[in-house]
């Protein structure tokens, strides 16, 4: 029987990224996305595999650092809350044109009904605008499976993938 764990959505995404061969995670702290990077930082697999974990100065910087890692052929994850997509918009939209070498997954933790933030925003429109595919899991298991698929898809298509999380962190 397979090992089973009870995880929040953010934790499922972090564990799926680690199991997908993550090389680095870049983020700007902000609920509801902070827990993803914290989980990776504290997981023994990240230390064992020397996964680079960095809190960036802002979301645009995090996006650019993750792009740099991807350009080098490594799998990178960038995490931000929904309003962080506004800050990272320039780098995110242009990444649809510059592409990615290693898998690049951009996580936007949207917050419908303002459960843990100051406003509502639907980040799917950024994906549509930038011609970047958007994956939106609805359960923790889907989140774990989908992030692994997202890295593979990004590498095969040579473009980033946007994963929209909406209240899956609860």
Q: Whereabouts are the PLM-identified features?
A:
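Conserved anion/nucleotide-ligand pocket segment
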Residues: 144, 151-163
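Conserved beta-strand positions
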Residues: 27, 163-165
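Thiamine diphosphate
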Residues: 1-148
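Conserved small/polar residues in nucleotide/adenosyl-binding loops
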Residues: 168-170
